[in-house]
Structure formats: C-alpha cells, structure tokens
A protein has these predicted regions:
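Bacterial N-terminal signal peptides
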Residues: 13-26
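Extracytoplasmic/lumenal domain signature
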Residues: 59-75, 109-135, 151, 166-198, ...
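Mature N-terminal segment immediately following signal peptide/propeptide cleavage
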Residues: 32-77, 93-95, 243
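Repeat-blade elements of multi-bladed beta-propeller folds
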Residues: 38-42, 84-108, 136-165, 199-227, ...
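Sec/Tat-exported extracytoplasmic proteins
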Residues: 42-45, 57, 68-74, 97, ...
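Bacterial Sec-dependent signal peptides at the C-terminal "C-region" and cleavage site
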Residues: 24-34
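N-terminal secretory signal peptides that target proteins for export/translocation
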Residues: 1-13
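Intrinsically disordered, low-complexity Ser/Thr- and acidic-rich flexible linkers and loops
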Residues: 79-83
C-alpha cells in the first residue's frame, strides 16, 4: 500500500445515509475514463457505475428513439443447433474510442461502430462445437474487459471464457496477440496450487484491470450436495502484455498462510470453492484489488470443514503487485446456504462529519449492504 494513503473501510450505507455526502469525481479522475465511454462492467474499475454525461434528463427521456439494433452472434448458432440453449443475455456493453464491445452467452465477442451499430470485427472460438453445456449456470457470459497500454497506443479486449482460457484481442481489429500466453491464449487450468477438476469449472465474468495487471476469478460448480473435495477458487493475476502469471491468492489458505487455522482438521487440504465468480473492484491509488468471495464446498453442509473458514464469504483487499492479503472482512463465519456476494463492491469517497473516508459499499444476499 502506498505510504500515507488512507485504506478503504467497509461501511454500512444504510447507517450513514442521513449524514454522508458521496463524492465520485475523485474516483472517476483516477480511473481515467473519458466522458461518454464505459471501460468496465461498472464503467470503471472502481465499479462506480456513474456517468458524468447530462444530455439525457427526466425532461427529454420520453423523446429517445432507437438509433440502431444489433442481432447477437449467438442467434444464428442457436437456430442451426437445437441442443444449444443459452441463458439470459448478461453482458454489459463497453464503449471506448468509438467502438462498442459486447460478448454473447456462447462465449463470442463483437466490436460495433457506436454510431451505426455496424460490426467492425467479431470473434467466435466456437466453444459450443465441443461442449454440451458449461458447468453450473450453462451458457451465459457476463462481459469483457478493456485495457489501454500506457506505454503505447495499444488497446486490448480481455475475455475469460467457457473453454477455460483467457484471450487477448486487439481492440481495433479483433486479432489475437501471438505473444500473449500461447498464440493469444492463457490456459487457466494451469498454475493452481493444487489439483483441480476442470470439468467442474468455467469462466464467464470480466477480469479486473489494474495498471498492467489482469486479475481473474472463476466459477466452480457448486450444485452437488454430496461434494466434499472440490477445486479451489484461487484468484490469479497475469501480465497484460505477456500473459505471464504474476501471483496467486489462495482464497482457502494453504500450509502456514494466514487464516489456515480457521479450517480445522486440516480441511483446507481438500475443501474448495470460495471463489470470486462475480466482479472485483480496483483502487490503483491504494494499490489494492477487492475480492468478493463465495461459499466453501459444499454450499449446504459444513460438517467436514469446522471453523470460520477464511476467506469464504469475505471482502479481501489484496495488494495488486504482490498478491498478498492486506485486510479482510468476513461477513459470514463458516458459511452455509450460498449467502455469498453476488456482485462486485462499489468504491466510494465519502465525507462523514467533515472527515474524508475511502469506503466500500457491498451488496449481499444477507439482507445487509
């Protein structure tokens, strides 16, 4: 953490709403997203979901008309193959430098002219040719990530996908980068600290972008109630230019790591999940990425993993450069019933009684924010 920087605090927005002023301009300038553009699922890596544009108002909203329509790439595939049944369209479109970027439920991607909706490029790895149905939630995809190189004019689209690969695409042409990983791909089944069952894993959420570091979570199938052993939900970071893995954070501590004693009977050796399946948030000024973690294996019974089970159902602040835990907040000790965090945290600069606080607002399944 940079010297002299104030750490972020997890706060209850419901308790502060009467006397808190929320300030977003500082975060937006930090994120360096031009007005009118949308570079991440929440517009910026702080996940503010705030646009400074003021052209559309309550007075003129009813005058809006459809400018163009785009038919998803997945539609033609589904019409030709009855066995493929995608779920809801969950991708949040990005917009940068005049192009709109979107993914489909089948793991495809497209760049569209923002003014006309005409396709500029498309990307289709045809994962559906060799896969009946991705584990857990089936065919769905939550979106892409945009990265602009501060050392050149290079811009990339990153996509983690159902084929357990991370791909880097040229944002202007859609071409893969042959020097990223292996021919443009990073094999996400490699680099775990222990054995995994790849048949029960998938990737569909946008990766987090922090400077020249790309950080990815995962989806681990959690629908088998008899499951004890399971693949871990470790979070990993990669170099945005080369695809080389920088670090791994064990969401279930291993060996002598902090928190391993919260897994009694050495249950850390075989327990799994505790993954980040949703979105993360990044504060580059503090040098931290914030991980909203899930429930351990299995979701419904914890008799084989006594203890508080860190870092399950927690917000974990991790150093972007080293992958080391800085702090954590565990919402549920010894989690059951799948009460994990269903979305990424929102980073807020707030003022409480004249005191500026860097804060985190986290929506949960636990009836608290």
């Amino acid at each position: 953490m940079p010297t002299g920087q104030q750490p972020r605090l997890l706060v209850s927005i419901t308790r502060l709403v009467a006397f808190v002023t929320v300030v977003t301009t500082g975060l937006l300038s930090e994120a360096q997203v031009p007005d009118g553009e949308w570079h991440a699922f929440g517009r910026d890596e702080a996940n503010t979901k705030y646009s400074p544009l003021d052209h559309i108002t309550a007075d003129n909203f009813s005058d809006l008309e459809i400018a163009w329509r785009w038919t998803s790439l997945s539609r033609a595939v589904v019409e030709e193959n009855e066995r493929i049944r995608p779920s809801a369209f969950k991708s949040s479109p990005l917009m940068a430098d005049g192009l709109v970027y979107v993914s489909t439920a089948l793991g495809q991607a497209a760049a569209l002219d923002a003014g006309t909706g005409e396709p500029v490029w498309t990307y289709d790895p045809r994962i559906y040719d060799d896969m009946e149905r991705p584990p857990n939630m089936g065919w769905h995809h939550r979106g892409l990530s945009y990265w602009k190189d501060d050392q050149s004019d290079d811009a990339r689209i990153f996509m983690s996908n159902h084929d357990l690969k991370l791909v880097a695409l040229n944002a202007r042409t859609g071409a893969r980068y042959p020097d990223f990983g292996e021919n443009g791909y990073v094999d996400l089944t490699q680099g775990y600290g222990r054995a995994i069952d790849a048949s029960r894993m998938t990737y569909s959420s946008p990766v987090a972008v922090a400077g020249d570091t790309i950080i990815t979570g995962s989806i681990v199938q959690d629908t088998n109630i008899r499951l004890r052993e399971a693949s871990p939900g470790d979070v990993r970071a990669y170099d945005a230019r080369t695809g080389v893995m920088k670090w791994i954070f064990h969401t279930i501590p291993q060996g002598d790591e902090f928190g391993v004693d919260s897994w009694q009977n050495e249950s850390w050796r075989y327990s799994g999940h505790t993954n980040v399946w949703s979105y993360m948030a990044v504060d580059e000024e503090l040098g931290l990425v914030f991980l909203p973690t899930g429930t351990p294996s299995n979701d419904w019974y914890g008799g084989m993993r006594p203890g508080n089970n860190l870092f399950a159902e927690s917000i974990v602040a991790v150093d972007i450069e080293t992958g080391q835990r800085v702090w954590h907040f565990q919402a549920i000790h010894h989690g059951l019933w799948d009460w994990d965090f269903p979305t990424g945290p929102n980073l807020l600069d707030i003022t409480v009684d004249g005191r500026e606080i860097k804060a985190i607002a986290q929506v949960s399944k636990q009836a608290f924010t």
